[in-house]
UniProtKB/Swiss-Prot annotation:
Segments crossing the lipid bilayer: none
Signal peptide (residue range): none
Name under which the protein is recorded: Peptidoglycan hydrolase FlgJ
Gene Ontology molecular function, alphabetical: amidase activity; hydrolase activity, acting on glycosyl bonds
Keywords: Bacterial flagellum biogenesis, Cell wall biogenesis/degradation, Glycosidase, Hydrolase, Periplasm
Originating gene: flgJ
Cysteines paired by S-S bonds: none
EC number(s) from the headed UniProt entry: 3.2.1.-
Domain of life: Bacteria
Top-level EC class: hydrolase
Described function: Flagellum-specific muramidase which hydrolyzes the peptidoglycan layer to assemble the rod structure in the periplasmic space.
GO biological process, one term: bacterial-type flagellum-dependent cell motility
Region (Catalytic) location: 159-308
Amino acid sequence: MMKNPNDIGFIHDISSLDSLRQKAVKEGKDGEQEALHAAARQFESIFTSMMLKSMREANEGFESNIMNSQNEKFYRQMLDEQMASELSANGSMGLADMIVAQLTAGQGNDKSETAMRDAANSAVEYRRVDPKKAREIEKRLIESGELSRTSHTPAKFDSPESFVNSMKPYAEKAAKALGVEPSLLLAQAALETGWGQKVVQNARGSSNNLFNIKADRSWQGDKVTTQTLEFHDNTPVKETAAFRSYSNYQDSFNDYVRFLNDNPRYETALQQRGDSESFIRGIHRAGYATDPTYADKVLQVKQKIESM
């Protein structure tokens, strides 16, 4: 069955264009118009993705090393691709409408001229955007609800310090229950979420999952499915996985403590909880994360937090 033509889906799903062509041939004029609109939105999503890529490249010189790793760039690329797809699906840029209006203007339809004029005005608004303001645009799209809630989207934390200050009370409580340093939990949450900027989102907003704990068979609560990066034989691979969703950040910290205490594979690591380095390397070896440098990264972030 053909996908809903109003659903742009994943930006690189170019094979769907052949389905649009077949639909146009089989269903006559109505199918042709429907396919035209869908193809225009596909083109707009690709154009928008290219524009966002240019913005990111223009802004690279202003980014710190800790927020500009390969993992960060990978998730940022996924965010931009999904943003481009969603903006096109919602008609937010107006480029698709302008394309359709131009291609149908010869039919003498006054509505086409109006749509073309409105779309042109909308497109001009975006062409005037300064590439250096990419982050501000991204934030505004999230606040206005234009950005997909199923993607990794920035949260309210505007700096590493604000993330640490907000999470510190929860981390201290969880660290006491677990018997580890609060700074270690803060570091792990910071690494997993990019200082709170990449918390997995669900239909209601944030999943509040600070430790990216997946929703396995034992999980009976809410969950959200999204793309993630896993390492196989030290090679990063994009995968789709279900993650746990919580009502608030406190629940996320509480579940992290339960997750480690109730899982036998972390028993050896928990016996070394008095030594932060041994503990984080222990849960890493036990399979908490597939990134081969995960423990080293957590410890580096921990040092940064302790120097704040």
